[in-house]
């Protein structure tokens, strides 16, 4: 099983052992740690949306890509890795994810629940896989240095 398959199943709520892969820490985080914090954020975000029962969700909190654990970790390393293409790609994909989630919140807050659900089911998993690919590439490059 590769990381993309593991992430896709994990986002569906399945408990599966992390695949043997890059076992390296960057700023105190392993690849598994980074992916698990992303999965946790997505899971908590979905729970808030369901629990809201149609009440407005916090748009600013969702859009803030520096407030989640993964985003805080990325921001803490920005000055160190900002010139690395793999880091910039990862940073951008993470920001894209939060922007997409914010657009879904806007749909939800405007009572366009079906559109929000469709977007959440199609866009967020794809962007999560992009983040997984970007994280893996970043870790591999850093490990070689």
Question: Where on the chain are the PLM-derived regions?
Answer:
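N-terminal membrane-sensor/transducer module of prokaryotic signaling receptors
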Residues: 1-145
């Amino acid at each position: 099983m590769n990381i993309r398959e593991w992430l896709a199943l994990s986002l569906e709520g399945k408990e599966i052992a992390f695949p043997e892969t890059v076992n390296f820490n960057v700023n105190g985080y392993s690849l598994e740690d980074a992916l698990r914090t992303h999965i946790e954020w997505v899971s908590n975000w979905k729970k808030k949306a369901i629990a809201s029962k149609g009440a407005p969700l916090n748009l600013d909190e969702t859009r803030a890509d520096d407030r989640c654990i993964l985003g805080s970790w990325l921001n803490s390393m920005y000055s160190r890795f900002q010139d690395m293409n793999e880091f910039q790609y990862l940073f951008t994909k993470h920001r894209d994810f939060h922007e997409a989630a914010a657009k879904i919140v806007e749909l939800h807050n405007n009572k366009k629940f079906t559109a929000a659900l469709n977007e959440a089911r199609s866009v967020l998993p794809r962007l999560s896989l992009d983040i997984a690919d970007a994280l893996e590439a970043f870790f591999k490059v850093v490990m070689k240095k």
